UniProtKB/Swiss-Prot annotation:
[4Fe-4S] cluster binds at residues 270, 273, 305, 312. The keyword rRNA-binding does not apply. HAMAP family: IspG. Its EC number is 1.17.7.3. Pathway: Isoprenoid biosynthesis; isopentenyl diphosphate biosynthesis via DXP pathway; isopentenyl diphosphate from 1-deoxy-D-xylulose 5-phosphate: step 5/6. It catalyses: (2E)-4-hydroxy-3-methylbut-2-enyl diphosphate + oxidized [flavodoxin] + H2O + 2 H(+) = 2-C-methyl-D-erythritol 2,4-cyclic diphosphate + reduced [flavodoxin]. It is an enzyme of class 1 (oxidoreductase). This is 4-hydroxy-3-methylbut-2-en-1-yl diphosphate synthase (flavodoxin). InterPro entries: Dihydropteroate_synth-like_sf, IspG_bac, IspG_bac-typ, NO2/SO3_Rdtase_4Fe4S_sf. Gene3D superfamilies: Dihydropteroate synthase-like, Sulfite Reductase Hemoprotein, domain 1. Keywords: 4Fe-4S, Iron, Iron-sulfur, Isoprene biosynthesis, Metal-binding, Oxidoreductase. The keyword 4Fe-4S applies.
Length: 371
């Protein structure tokens, strides 16, 4: 059960990265980027698999050398998730990694080289039927744009993006998505609002170099949350100085909080006070860890006393109202039964897993009926 204000999402052109649709009516996808040595195939594959387990729809892999291109080809064979190759400066790497199986190329047409080299890359992308992401960052704008605007701002980032877009459009290539990232929340939001008014291709949202886990998550939630509420954005990446699977989790937490896309358990819990009938923080910390693998969407409310407990529990799929020695369980808004307060973690985990199985079976039956 949930309530939400409608979000009027901006209608964009739909493109495909592998089998994942980006833009149009497709769900907003969540992606991350590996931080291993790409040449360490085993470590990179293991990291990608951890991200996929966390829910990643797409993964980006850096390919700065021809050795990494060779490794990319091996990685491509070992994972099922679509892979985006991150390429800078050397157009030959872009050509080689496309041939090695890249599902998308992340480039800046402005730093790949001459028009002839850009034409080669675009022809290659057309040949392999893969899209290109134009990635503009506030920290690496072209020198003439820096001189013109003196400092990074939304207009400067828009001009850089439109310059790169014009290169692709002149080559009759429209299978692209765009990002205009900055490490500053306000600059990021301004740039995306400006570009969204100019183009109808998909937008990849992110705050670049957002920082360490806590502060980076906050910056990303503010910037991306505000843009998503405005209906802007088709795929997101949370850039953190942390393990990439944590980026995936935060990305889905943002989408869940906006009722845009649910993936796993949405935890609702009180901050706890002297009224609590059990250790709320201990219970919730344990549950968050134990239930990380759940993918079926549901709301779980755990409140430590009867002041706000019943109201929150009625709005959740599973709700707990704390009391001693027994706590009251609500199921789908209705009172259900009592459970031992001393054994809350095990009891709640069991109920959540059972509900997840019910939801999975229901979803499978709906798929069968459609077929």
């Amino acid at each position: 059960m949930s309530t939400s204000a409608p979000i009027n999402r901006r209608l964009t052109k739909k493109i495909y990265v592998g089998d994942v649709a980006i833009g149009g009516d497709a769900p907003i996808s969540v992606q991350s980027m590996t931080n291993t040595d790409t040449c360490d195939v085993a470590a990179t594959v293991a990291q990608i698999e951890r991200c996929v387990e966390a829910g990643a729809d797409l993964m980006r892999v850096s390919t700065p050398t021809m050795d990494t291109v060779k490794a990319f080809g091996e990685i491509r064979k070992l994972v099922s998730v679509p892979l985006i190759a991150d390429v800078h400066f050397d157009h030959k790497i872009a050509l080689a990694v496309a041939a090695a199986g890249a599902d998308c190329l992340r480039i800046n047409p402005g730093n790949i080289g001459s028009d002839a080299k850009v034409r080669e890359v675009v022809a290659c992308a057309k040949h392999y039927n893969i899209p290109i992401r134009i990635g503009v960052n506030a920290g690496s704008l072209e020198k003439d744009i820096q001189r013109k605007y003196k400092e990074p701002n939304g207009a400067a980032m828009l001009e850089s993006a439109m310059r790169h877009i014009d290169i692709l459009e002149r080559l009759n290539f429209d299978q692209y998505k765009v990002s205009v990232k900055a490490s500053n929340v306000f600059l990021t939001m301004d740039a995306y609002r400006l570009i969204s008014a100019q183009i109808d291709n998909p937008l990849h949202l992110g705050v670049t170099e957002a920082g360490v886990y806590r502060t980076g998550s906050v910056k990303s939630a503010i910037a991306l949350g505000g843009l998503l509420l405005d209906g802007i954005g088709d795929t997101i990446r949370i850039s953190l100085a942390a393990e990439p699977e944590e980026e995936i989790k935060i990305g889905f937490d943002i989408l869940k909080s906006l009722n845009i896309r649910s993936n796993g358990v949405n935890f609702i819990a009180c901050p706890s006070c002297s009224r609590q009938e059990f250790d709320v923080i201990r219970v919730m910390t344990a549950l968050e860890s134990r239930l990380e693998d759940i993918r079926e969407p549901m709301n779980l409310s755990v409140i430590g006393c009867k002041v706000n407990g019943p109201g929150e529990a009625k709005e959740a799929d599973i709700g707990i109202v704390g009391a001693a020695p027994k706590s009251l369980v609500y199921r789908m808004g209705e009172k259900s039964h009592l459970i031992d307060t001393d054994n809350l973690v095990d009891e709640i985990e069991g109920m959540v897993r059972a509900h997840a199985e019910e939801l999975a079976k229901k979803r499978e039956n709906e798929i069968i009926r459609v077929r």
